[in-house]
Amino acid sequence: MMWLASLSLVLPVVAGQAALYGQCGGNGWTGATTCVSGACCTYSNAWYSQCLPCSTTLTTTKSSTTSSSTTSTVHSTSTATSTSTCSLPSVYKWTSTGSLANPESGFVSLKDFSAVPYNGQHLVYASDVNNAGNYGSLSFGLFSDWNAMSSASQNVMSHGAVAPNLFYFAPKNIWVMAYEWGASPFMYMTSSDPTNPNGWSSPQSLFSGSISGSSPIDPALIADDTTMYLFFAGDNGHIYRSSMPIGDFPSNFGTSYTTILSDSTYNLFEAVQVYRVKGQNQYLMIVECIGANGRYFRSFTATSLGGSWTPQATSESAPFAGKANSGATWTNDISSGDLIRSSPDQTMPIDPCNLQFLYQGRDPSSTASYNLLPYRPGLLTLVR
């Protein structure tokens, strides 16, 4: 995701106005619905509108808010890109950065990235692994350019949240972080300030169920207008789904689930993520797999989150992302990560015109045990 050079622009804030890159509308939003001078309230989806520089806007429309006044907004992406729409490609080809950051002293690995846009910058949480092979979690200090990730602070969380899944839940104006390995298979915490890694609420159970012969792993949350969905894997060749009415979230999904995809163990292994494709009546699911040449991702599409999924890019030789098409020279593995979202809300929107993927890679010559493999962040950018 690329933000405008005008990030450095400072606009005067008047009482009752939302700041540049602040929220200004959406269903359930009770805050300011007008922006500071020079910024326009920009529609992203029914739950989220954001103050963006007016110079990036083209066409006006009305946003959905519960306010008594209606704000004139424009159709532009939350990443301040063009208003054009794109389809997902049938064949993917990427370019890749090198390693973007190294773990601090005492740690061997940075993994499982979850990234959201936040006030015009990137906010990233991740799992970390220390020299003894023990897992924890951290946040990176805010940064505007991916090349600056290497110098961003790494802020260890006092309460570990392994495999974090971070988003803004607009209906209740809170930030949510889901994760694994707690009192229940999946847990969640909430916060009003996601930049404070130790400002999260006490953990609550997100899912209490079990799966035969394995354990639930890698929670992925996404919502439509009426329903919140939980997708997860099991390192066993299956992908699972649970759901609840959106008005009940955040709370425990309980123990019930549906198996929605089945294949061999390595063909549907872990790290499932689900996104809404902007400008299309389509959702994208990616799943990490194990191949002859390392970790790679297969992709599936659907027209509804509660519906069936159609294979899209599913072979190791022509994957969604892997050694065959990543363009990376420093890693064979394209492993657990997050597509860069165009806004941070619970609908998980991605812009296929500007698709990027924050992933974990590693030196392929490393022979350490899995927990001690030297994973680092890298960024793929789709070649169109």
Swiss-Prot record:
Residues 59-85 are annotated as: Disordered. Synergistic reactions with other polysaccharadide degrading enzymes such as lytic polysaccharide monooxygenases (LPMOs) are important for industrial applications. Its EC number is 3.2.1.55. Keywords: Carbohydrate metabolism, Glycosidase, Hydrolase, Polysaccharide degradation, Secreted, Signal, Xylan degradation. It comes from the Eukaryota. Residues 1-16 form the signal peptide. It catalyses: Hydrolysis of terminal non-reducing alpha-L-arabinofuranoside residues in alpha-L-arabinosides. One of its GO terms (biological process) is L-arabinose metabolic process. Pfam families: CBM_1 (PF00734), Glyco_hydro_62 (PF03664). InterPro entries: CBD_sf (IPR035971), Cellulose-bd_dom_fun (IPR000254), GH62_arabinosidase (IPR005193), Glyco_hydro_beta-prop_sf (IPR023296). It is found in: Secreted. Residues 17-52 form the CBM1 domain. Gene3D superfamilies: Glycosyl hydrolase domain, family 43. GO terms for molecular function: alpha-L-arabinofuranosidase activity; cellulose binding. One of its GO terms (cellular component) is extracellular region. The keyword Amino-acid biosynthesis does not apply. Alpha-L-arabinofuranosidase involved in the hydrolysis of xylan, a major structural heterogeneous polysaccharide found in plant biomass representing the second most abundant polysaccharide in the biosphere, after cellulose. Releases L-arabinose from arabinoxylan. Belongs to the glycosyl hydrolase 62 family. This is Alpha-L-arabinofuranosidase A. It comes from Penicillium parvum. The lineage of its organism: Eukaryota, Fungi, Dikarya, Ascomycota, Pezizomycotina. The gene is ABF62A.
